[in-house]
Amino acid sequence: MLLVHGFLGTRGTMMPLAKRFQDDGRTTFTYHHGTFQLRSLLSGAQELVEHIDRLQRTLGVERFDVVGFSMGGLIALQAVKFMQAHRAIRRLALLGAPTDGTWVGLLGVATMGLLSQSVWQCLPTSDFIADLRAAPLPPGLRVRQIHASQDALCPLPEPLEGIDRDHDFIVLPGGHSSLVVSHGFYRELKSFFEESHGDDARSPGGHDAEAAAE
């Protein structure tokens, strides 16, 4: 299990979530990908790919489950859509990821716009968000979007193309910080990663898509 933190976060922000996974017997990794994630999200995605590659070589593990929290979800999505990271990822959970962008980024532009490319990239009008939404999900990769209904930092987006709206677009009560500390959100993550492999037929290019094509 690999956890990817968000904007102005550090690996420490993911520790409550990491501890829950570890207590349930899952080997869980967090990692540092830039000071408070101020760099370009493209750089963050490349670093994620390199980190996964190092873990594969060090541990001898072929595939990982990944949770991308907030802007970390955009990083993970960039990695699987454009950098072939899906080859090393079994399932991806986007936890409060602003996949439609967020105007809260304007506050970041006012305070850190000269220092941080990422605050510009997460605006709803950015080319980064447009390209990220337009690119298809890789065939066979199961992705679940999990959101908080009162999340002021990440307003509820539309489901990504290829997401099963009935099963893999989850909205629960809470705010942005609830996503990594509330047991309800953890329960949804745990359920997603523990579902049987047969449930991956809902993924783009899965068995359901093949049956429809026939």
Each model region followed by its residue ranges:
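Typically the conserved alpha-helix immediately C-terminal to a functionally engaged Cys/Sec
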Residues: 17-18
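Serine-dependent carboxylesterase/thioesterase catalytic core
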Residues: 1-7, 11-12, 21-137, 157
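Helical cap/lid subdomain of alpha/beta-hydrolase-fold lipid enzymes
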Residues: 81-214
